[in-house]
Amino acid sequence: EPAIYFKEQFLDGXGFTDXRIKEK
């Protein structure tokens, strides 16, 4: 879900890739 994906990205503060890797 984009919402969670965006939330993770903001929490990490690293970027889209970081969030994506974390999610996957």
Curated annotation (Swiss-Prot):
Pancreas. GO terms for biological process: protein stabilization. Its main location: endoplasmic reticulum. It is found in: Endoplasmic reticulum lumen; Cytoplasm, Cytosol; Cytolytic granule; Secreted, Extracellular space, Extracellular matrix. It comes from the Eukaryota. GO terms for molecular function: calcium ion binding; carbohydrate binding. GO terms for cellular component: cell surface; cortical granule; cytolytic granule; cytosol; extracellular region; sarcoplasmic reticulum lumen. Keywords: Calcium, Chaperone, Cytoplasm, Cytoplasmic vesicle, Endoplasmic reticulum, Extracellular matrix, Lectin, Lysosome, Metal-binding, Sarcoplasmic reticulum, Secreted, Zinc. Calcium-binding chaperone that promotes folding, oligomeric assembly and quality control in the endoplasmic reticulum (ER) via the calreticulin/calnexin cycle. This lectin interacts transiently with almost all of the monoglucosylated glycoproteins that are synthesized in the ER. Interacts with the DNA-binding domain of NR3C1 and mediates its nuclear export. Involved in maternal gene expression regulation. May participate in oocyte maturation via the regulation of calcium homeostasis. Monomer. Component of an EIF2 complex at least composed of CELF1/CUGBP1, CALR, CALR3, EIF2S1, EIF2S2, HSP90B1 and HSPA5. Interacts with PDIA3/ERp57 and SPACA9. Interacts with TRIM21. Interacts with NR3C1. Interacts with PPIB. Interacts (via P-domain) with PDIA5. Interacts with CLCC1. Belongs to the calreticulin family. This is Calreticulin. The lineage of its organism: Eukaryota, Metazoa, Chordata, Craniata, Vertebrata. The gene is CALR.
